[in-house]
Every structure is written in structure tokens, then in C-alpha cells.
Amino acid sequence: PPSTVGVKAEVEALQKGIASLYPDINGLPELKQEASRFIKAFINVDLKPEGCVPVTGSMQGTFASFLTCSQCNEEKDTILFIDPGFPVQKQQLVVMGQKYETFDVYDFRGDKLKEKLESYLEKGNISAIIYSNPNYPSWICLSDKELRIIGELATRYDVIVLEDLAYFAMDFRKDLSTPFQVPYQPSVAHYTDNYILLISG
């Protein structure tokens, strides 16, 4: 059976007339507030509620993020994938008529990642970098050192990082399940302000 807490909240929302209104395009304020609190609790990043945008799924969030990133600077018309990743995300870019480049991170771990990323970023056409961490299907996890490299290069080259956290806190080598306590879910958000976190709820 469904959670009684969820059912009660839905009934209360219906009684308050939620079904008679179009949803706020920016998201329900209570949900934005709780998203901000969740990010602080499990990533240890301060993100204002107005920066949290609820969507109907991470794929919609990715689509909107691709659309936004690819239109910020007309000289930056390409998204860079650190693979392995989700093939459907590349398909989204095909649908949009946007360009993308890709490389497999397997041979470019640690310090090698910096040189590989710079070989793309120095061209000046990359608007965003996307990766999944923890990664599915390989289950590799980018280290804090690698996230720092990505973050610092994103700042230097003015690129937006799309961090897909679909498998949030699923690095089971350590317990990431206790809110407001180390260890936290690693994130590029500690190393740059140029980021979008895609969190599946």
C-alpha cells in the first residue's frame, strides 16, 4: 500500500484546491524549500530554494538543461559527455539538433582527466559537460580529485557542469544515508559555481 504520509498530504492538497490551479512553473515553494534542505543534508552544499526547480523527471530536467546551456553563448554549441552515460541523453540532443562530443573516462582517471578535458575545452565550443556519478552501468565513481579537476576547468573555461545524480548516494562503500553528517555525496558543486545538479526523487 502507498505511504499514509503521502496519501494524507495528497488529500490535504486536494482539499486546498490544488487541482483547480495550474502548477507554478517555478515549482511548489514547499518542494523547493525541501529540495534545498535535502541538498544541504546530503551533499553539504548551500543552494537557495529559488535555485531548485522541480520537474516531472530527471530526463525532463536534462532536456531543459541542455536547451538552456546550448543557448547561453552562440559560440558554445556542443555538449561534452564523460562516458559511459545514458544514450537517451544523446538522443535528446539529436532531437534538438544540438552537437555533442564524447569520450570514455575509463582510460582518463585521476590526473589524466585534466589533460583530456582541456583538449576539448580549449577549442571554445563546449557549453556544458555532463556525466553520471555514481555511474550506471559501470558503477565507477568519480573521486573528489576528479570532481575538483572538472569544477576548476569549468570555472576557467566558463562551462556549465551537468551532474547527473540519478544514482544518488549509491556508492555503498561508505554510508551516505545520514543527513547533515559526513560522509556526503561527492559533488562538483564544491569546486565550481557553474553547475546544475540533476537529482532523481
Walk through the language-model features, giving the residues of each:
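Glycine-rich phosphate-binding segment of PLP-dependent enzymes
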Residues: 2-22
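PLP-dependent aminotransferase class I/II
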Residues: 3, 194-201
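Conserved core of the PLP fold type I
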Residues: 15-154, 168-192, 196
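Short glycine-centered segments of the SAM/dcSAM-binding site in methyltransferase folds
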Residues: 78, 159-160
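Walker B catalytic acidic pair
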Residues: 164-165
